[in-house]
């Protein structure tokens, strides 16, 4: 390209005759006869190049009957032929050849070169087209509605190998193409139908003339194709009984093809009669023949059918005796004299013999011959058929490898059916009876005999019959019975039936399979109908509810137009019931059991069942109400429920938890007043694993202390104390010990038992002389008090918050009364000595607390409830009180420690819906009010407990705080008096519920 937009001059070279640079168009394009006029003395041979040919095509409009279609090869051939004729005419006339481009050779060559370079392929440009363009749809991505896009050019779209366009050929790019599948399913078992050989051009070995040779070969191919289609049709009719309904279309297509070819085969037979003379074929003649079921050329029904050479392409066929068409059930077996057979037309035999001479051996013929020999060996060697003692006998046949049948095509389809029945009925029949196996069950033998008698009673032996309502159940019984037997026994049973009924064994097996398939379909249909009725009953109510929800939704949507959260659209939700699930599972089970009989080849069980659920079951509901995945989910749910129901009867003996050893030995080792041991052993502590050892150690120490309790009587200690209480005031009318009113009110703990028998207060027992009886009574009262505290602290304790005698009233009204009424017994001259029994251990469930501060606060409050005794006698001051030291601080046994956490402010949270049913102590039933014991209610696992406390007092009240400080001082005095040398002796005798025993200090 020159600068400034100026055009550059180019030198053009003219095309000369000897230049081979433009071999694409030919150096002699302007001189067609140049090659012939070239001198012969040239050493190099002249290269013959192809000429450009101009083809003129006339396009016409496409209508419903025709459309323009051109074959380039044929057009090229016709054009060359036309050019050759014109050349011959011009040569004969002696006129010189005229070249259309003789005037402007250079211009034409230049234009052709430019156009070839611009629009040509790789030959002109020198580079090939990319392979990816071959697999690209050039019409992809264009806007069909755009008028600028030109879609009038025809091009070949990408079409899969297994598909073809609906009408075939090429299309203008307008819309999507419609395809049809080229593959056709076929379940036939015939060898020649499975192995499809391509048709080859066969050469004739003998021919009289070229015209007759061409016509005979064409007729031969037509006759061969017609007979093959006839054989395919006859086998497809037999196989259609065991195939599914989808195969009926294939059979109808083959029938139509066969009827069209019958006329062509009739023409070929007439040509053989008129034009050919050859050797007679060997004909086997016996005394029996099958009557013709259709007329010959005359159209009438003669009593006999001529027998020709026995050449079959399918299987060994008897040439003389055949069973009549029992589908019609009217034609009996008739005989034909041998004299009539001898007078057969010789032209038919000659035609058949000529076929054998003309045909060449192909791979297809060899395969058929091998197949025929195999079938013959399977059926066994046979003798010549004849009539003897009224029984049919087998006959040996001359098997030919020819592809034609015995002129069946000219007699119509009815005659072919009769011949097919004769072949099926006689080729494998038994010559002797087969005894039933002795190992068969009695019900199988009964079913076989019943079926034989039913067939014989109707005189249907040797006839292929259609099963009716009576015969179908009998055959089904036989078929189902032998399915569970050995293969050899099953073959013996059907061989016996074959001989008795004169019907082929495979025919009975096929009929049995058909009956079983129908039975399985009937079961599935019955179950599906039950489900349909149940759904029809439920659906009206479901639809009405859905419509109501829709109206409600419309009202809410209209009311809340500008709301941020619009109401949800109701869904079509079908409510399943146990009955509907059961019916659905019945349909699933019926389909599952029919898989072996109704499934197609290479179809899995899941595909088989899912197809039925999707196509049949889902359609029972209105559109949009049911999906396949929902059906599968309900079936799975029903399966799981069914398995759980089966496992339930076995579960109780296996899953029953054994009773703890401590609970079993409870009547002998521990009193029933304390339920702490059971609470410790049965459920594990919900704390971390580090507290397990502490829990076990504490429980063991408590069990040891409970075992050391005195067994005075078989009755519980509570009842014993109750009996001893009335006797004590009579023995000692003048008490020596007396509790302060405040202390008495503060520490009086009622022992709550199952019988609601309250034990006497400690002030009643302790205001008596210090004798052995007093010590025993004091010990019993202390045991009862300790058991009460343990009972209150146990997780399984059920308390009544409405009663006045409970643990929460310890520091409420009693404390206020004590602080308001000072003790009248305290004087200046009397020294108060606080004595008491050993403190009882209290077990705290650490799972109810989150921090150590709450645990310490609770332990101090429990320690404040220790029995406090005030002594007013001087003699009591010198009495030594023995107190056992314990590892537990203040009578509190810690069985586990949580990591400390920062105390959080109490925030009243919203009530939760759930209530955790964990093991909780009786102390954990406190509501939102931090009442008598000062717990933090957030530590408890109770949210919506209906049990609330009665009127309680706030511990922040100054009056209550003063009372608490007085109690604390009394506790300190009690501890000092207990460890002083002059403490009261004998207070520790008989105590069994205290802390672990240690050496007594005196």
From Swiss-Prot:
Biased-composition ranges, Low complexity, are 207-217, 286-320, 336-358, 395-404, 653-667, 690-701
Where does the secretion signal sit in this chain? none
**What happens after mutating residue 478 to E?**
Displays defects in aligning on the meiotic spindle
One of the protein's GO biological processes: female meiotic nuclear division
What do mutants without this gene show?
Females exhibit disrupted chromosome segregation in the first meiotic division and produce very low numbers of viable progeny. This female sterility is partially suppressed when some oocytes undergo precocious anaphase. Analysis of the X chromosome of these progeny demonstrates they have inherited the two maternal X-chromosome homologs and have no paternal chromosome markers. This suggests that they developed from diploid gametes that underwent gynogenesis, a form of parthenogenesis that requires fertilization.
Spell out the molecular function terms from Gene Ontology. Answer: DNA binding
Q: List the disulfide bonds.
A: none
Please give the tissue specificity annotation from the record for this chain.
Answer: Oocyte specific.
Q: Where does the record say this protein resides?
A: Nucleus, Nucleoplasm; Chromosome; Chromosome, Centromere, Kinetochore
Task: According to the UniProt record, list the residues that bear Phosphoserine.
Answer: 685, 689, 885-887
Q: Where is the composition biased (Basic residues)?
A: 903-917
Disordered: region residues: 193-358, 395-428, 642-725, 901-928
| Designated name of the protein | yemanuclein
Species annotation: Drosophila melanogaster (Fruit fly)
């Amino acid at each position: 390209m020159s600068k400034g937009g100026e055009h550059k001059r180019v030198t053009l070279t003219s095309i000369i005759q000897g230049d081979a640079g433009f071999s694409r168009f030919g150096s002699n394009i302007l001189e067609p006869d140049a090659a012939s006029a070239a001198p012969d003395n040239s050493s190099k041979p002249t290269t013959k190049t192809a000429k450009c040919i101009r083809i003129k095509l006339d396009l016409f409009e496409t209508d419903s009957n025709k459309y323009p279609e051109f074959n380039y090869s044929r057009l090229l051939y016709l054009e060359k032929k036309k050019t050759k004729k014109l050349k011959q005419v011009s040569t004969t006339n002696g006129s010189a050849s005229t070249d259309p481009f003789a005037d402007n050779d250079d211009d034409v060559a230049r234009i052709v070169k430019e156009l070839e370079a611009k629009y040509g392929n790789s030959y002109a440009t020198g580079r090939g087209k990319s392979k990816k363009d071959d697999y690209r749809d050039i019409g992809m991505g264009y806007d069909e509605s755009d008028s600028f896009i030109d879609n009038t050019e025809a091009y070949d779209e990408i079409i899969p190998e297994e598909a073809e366009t609906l009408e075939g050929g090429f299309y203008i790019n307008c819309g999507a193409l419609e395809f049809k599948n080229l593959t056709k399913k076929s379940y036939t078992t015939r060898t020649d139908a499975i192995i499809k050989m391509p048709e080859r051009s066969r050469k004739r070995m003998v021919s009289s003339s070229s015209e007759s040779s061409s016509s005979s070969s064409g007729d031969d191919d037509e006759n061969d194709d017609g007979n093959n289609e006839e054989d395919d049709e006859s086998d497809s009719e037999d196989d259609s009984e065991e195939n599914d309904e989808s195969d009926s279309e294939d059979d109808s297509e083959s029938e139509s093809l066969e009827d069209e070819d019958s006329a062509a085969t009739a023409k070929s037979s007439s040509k053989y009669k008129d034009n050919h003379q050859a050797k007679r074929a060997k004909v086997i003649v016996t005394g029996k023949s099958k009557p013709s079921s259709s007329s010959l050329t005359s159209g009438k029904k003669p009593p006999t059918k001529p027998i020709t050479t026995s050449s079959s392409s399918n299987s060994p066929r008897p040439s003389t005796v055949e069973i009549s068409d029992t589908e019609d059930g009217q034609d009996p077996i008739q005989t034909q004299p041998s004299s009539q057979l001898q007078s057969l037309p010789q032209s038919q035999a000659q035609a058949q013999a000529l076929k054998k001479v003309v045909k060449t051996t192909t791979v297809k013929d060899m395969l058929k011959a091998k197949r025929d020999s195999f079938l013959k060996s399977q059926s066994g060697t046979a003798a010549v058929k004849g009539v003897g003692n009224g029984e049919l006998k087998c006959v040996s046949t001359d098997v030919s490898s020819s592809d034609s049948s015995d002129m069946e095509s000219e007699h119509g389809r009815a005659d072919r059916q009769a011949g097919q029945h004769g072949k099926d009925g006689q080729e494998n029949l038994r010559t002797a009876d087969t005894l039933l196996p002795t190992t068969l069950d009695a019900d199988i033998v009964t079913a076989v005999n019943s079926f034989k008698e039913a067939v014989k009673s109707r005189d249907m032996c040797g006839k292929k019959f259609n099963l009716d309502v009576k015969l179908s159940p009998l055959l089904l019984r036989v078929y189902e019975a032998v399915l569970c037997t050995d293969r050899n026994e099953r073959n013996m049973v059907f061989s016996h039936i074959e001989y008795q009924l004169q019907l082929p064994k495979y025919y009975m097996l096929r009929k049995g399979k058909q009956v079983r398939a129908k039975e399985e379909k009937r079961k599935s249909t019955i179950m599906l109908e039950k489900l349909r009725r149940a759904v029809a009953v439920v659906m009206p109510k479901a639809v009405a509810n859905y419509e109501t929800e829709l109206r409600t939704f419309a009202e809410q949507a209209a009311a809340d137009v500008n709301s941020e959260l619009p109401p949800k659209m109701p869904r079509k939700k079908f409510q399943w019931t146990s009955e509907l699930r059961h019916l659905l599972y019945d349909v699933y089970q019926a389909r599952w059991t029919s898989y072996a009989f109704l499934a197609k080849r290479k179809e899995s069980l899941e595909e088989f069942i899912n197809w039925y659920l999707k196509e049949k079951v889902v359609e029972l509901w209105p559109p949009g109400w049911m999906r396949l995945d929902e059906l599968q989910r309900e079936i799975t749910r029903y399966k799981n429920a069914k398995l759980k129901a089966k496992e339930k009867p076995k579960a109780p003996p296996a899953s029953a938890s054994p009773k703890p050893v401590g609970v079993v030995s409870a009547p002998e080792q521990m009193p029933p007043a304390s339920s702490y041991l059971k609470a410790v052993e049965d459920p594990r502590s919900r704390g971390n694993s580090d507290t397990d050892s502490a829990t076990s150690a504490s429980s063991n120490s408590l069990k040891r202390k409970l075992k050391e309790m005195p067994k005075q009587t078989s009755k519980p200690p509570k009842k014993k104390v109750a009996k001893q209480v009335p006797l004590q005031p009579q023995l000692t009318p003048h008490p020596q010990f007396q509790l302060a009113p405040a202390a008495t009110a503060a520490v009086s703990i009622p022992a709550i038992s199952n019988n609601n028998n309250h034990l006497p207060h400690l002030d009643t027992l302790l205001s008596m002389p210090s004798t052995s009886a007093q010590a025993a009574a004091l010990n019993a009262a202390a045991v009862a008090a300790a058991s009460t505290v343990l009972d209150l602290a146990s997780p399984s304790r059920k308390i009544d918050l409405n009663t006045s005698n409970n643990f929460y009233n310890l520091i409420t009204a009693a404390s206020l009364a004590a602080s308001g009424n000072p003790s009248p017994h305290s004087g200046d001259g009397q020294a108060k000595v606080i004595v008491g029994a050993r403190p009882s251990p209290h077990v705290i469930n650490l799972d109810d607390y989150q921090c150590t501060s709450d645990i310490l606060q609770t332990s101090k409050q429990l320690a404040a409830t220790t029995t406090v005794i005030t002594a007013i006698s001087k003699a009591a001051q010198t009495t030594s009180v023995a107190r056992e030291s314990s590892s537990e601080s203040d009578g509190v046994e810690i069985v586990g420690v949580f990591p400390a956490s920062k105390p959080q402010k109490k925030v009243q949270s919203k009530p939760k819906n759930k209530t955790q049913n964990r093991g909780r102590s009786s102390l954990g039933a406190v509501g939102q009010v931090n009442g008598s014991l000062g717990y933090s209610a957030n530590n408890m696992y109770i949210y919506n407990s209906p049990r609330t406390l009665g009127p309680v007092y706030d511990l922040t009240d100054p009056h209550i705080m003063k009372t608490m400080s007085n109690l604390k001082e009394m506790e300190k005095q009690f501890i000092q008096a207990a460890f002083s040398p002059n403490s009261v002796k004998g207070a520790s005798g008989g105590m069994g519920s205290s802390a672990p025993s240690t050496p007594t200090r005196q």
